[in-house]
Amino acid sequence: MAYSACFLHQSALASSTARSSPSSSSQRYVSISKLVCKAQQTHEEDNSTVSRRLALTLLVGAAAVGSKVSPADAAYGEAANVFGKPKKNTDFTAYSGDGFQVQVPAKWNPSREVEYPGQVLRYEDNFDATSNLNVMVTPTDKKSITDYGSPEEFLSQVNYLLGKQAYFGETASEGGFDNNAVATANILETNIQDVGGKPYYYLSVLTRTADGDEGGKHQLITATVNGGKLYICKAQAGDKRWFKGANKFVEKAATSFSVA
């Protein structure tokens, strides 16, 4: 159509020129008609190019809408989920005991060692027995954990949880210990929270011994009273391993403890 329009336009101009203008004028009009023709052709070529690009864009867009993103695809810096299944937290295993439940580090093993009165559960780190979890259940005449007083007062009544001093004798003050003392305990934090209508005590304690090679032990204690029983969960790790990542396992285990 572009060339046909150009031919008709050029013929009309030429015949009009032949009747009214000299030869030189005819050449000028023909030249203009050629430019018009060229412009029309270029315009149609541009339209054709735009149409092809538009069609390609629509095709790509339709393909994107019609396809599903593969679960294995991952953004830069992220690991691909090759099998396309939702990721689960495999660091902990849920444990349900008689009247309580707790999240136990998955790489810790059950232990038969009995260290505390009323102990019903014990798990230890596969590579370091200093990192462990214990649950104790003992009878009590208290109706609530708050009947023991403040968290600090409660701890003084169950101080056996922190371990006993094995050596008794005269010693000089050394390494921050008092005279004749080879062990110390510092309460780092206490907290009281209501869970399911029951108050819970949370305590963070750092214990140290003169011969300890771990720089001390971080001990987290969770306690509550339910149905005439005192429930205590104690999780701990050595100070050195605490700052190398063991803290997240101990903290999760202690704070996950709850009674039915």
UniProtKB/Swiss-Prot annotation:
Q: Which UniProt keywords apply?
A: Chloroplast, Membrane, Phosphoprotein, Photosynthesis, Photosystem II, Plastid, Thylakoid, Transit peptide
- The source's superkingdom equals Eukaryota
A GO BP term here is: photosynthesis
Residues annotated with Phosphoserine modification: S150
Where found in the cell? Answer: Plastid, Chloroplast thylakoid membrane
One Pfam family, short name:
PsbP
Q: Has keyword Transit peptide?
A: yes
**Could you tell me which residues form the transit peptide?**
1-74
User: Per UniProt, what is one GO molecular function of this protein?
Assistant: calcium ion binding
Q: Which GO terms describe its cellular component?
A: chloroplast thylakoid membrane; extrinsic component of membrane; photosystem II oxygen evolving complex
Q: What induces it?
A: By light.
Which InterPro entries is this protein grouped with? Answer: Mog1/PsbP_a/b/a-sand, PsbP_C
Secretion signal span? none
User: What the protein does?
Assistant: May be involved in the regulation of photosystem II.
What does the similarity note say? Answer: Belongs to the PsbP family.
Identification of the protein by name: Oxygen-evolving enhancer protein 2, chloroplastic
Source organism per UniProt: Sinapis alba (White mustard)
Identify the coding gene.
PSBP
